[in-house]
A protein has these predicted regions:
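Interfacial/linker helices and their anchor residues that mediate assembly or domain coupling
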Residues: 67-106
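N-terminal positioning helix adjacent to the helix-turn-helix/winged-helix DNA-binding module
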Residues: 3, 43-47, 74
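Conserved amphipathic alpha-helical interaction elements at protein-protein interfaces in regulatory
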Residues: 13, 57, 99-102
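A short, Lys/Arg-rich alpha-helix, primarily the initiator
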Residues: 1-13
Length: 106
């Protein structure tokens, strides 16, 4: 998959509009559109990092050097969010996970 198509695919999978991704990355809507539709794109390392972060993937995945799946990327994004939560909230999430695990094993 080409770079621009990868961005567009990830963006739509996450339910983000061009405007929303642009806002999350400090870019313009037209810049994101150009990245998705022009070849070859030339984003800076800083922009690549911002876009990858907003889409919940690694830069390597974004540029096609890694085959991390969207599911893996979602897991990575979840754990990134999880690690930033207060300890009590993380404890509650772990307890919920144990309860759900018990229910699914029955």
């Amino acid at each position: 998959m080409k770079f621009g198509a990868r961005i567009k695919s990830l963006r739509t999978e996450k339910g983000l509009t061009l405007d929303q991704l642009a806002q999350e990355t400090g870019s313009s809507k037209s810049y994101i559109w150009e990245l998705e539709n022009k070849n070859p794109p030339r984003p800076s390392a800083e922009k690549l990092s911002a876009i990858a972060g907003a889409l919940g993937v690694t830069v390597d995945y974004l540029i096609g050097s890694d085959t991390q799946t969207l599911s893996d990327a979602e897991d990575t994004a979840f754990f990134r969010q999880y690690s930033g939560l207060p300890e009590e909230t993380r404890r509650q999430i772990r307890e919920m996970a144990r309860i759900l695990d018990t229910k699914t094993r029955k």
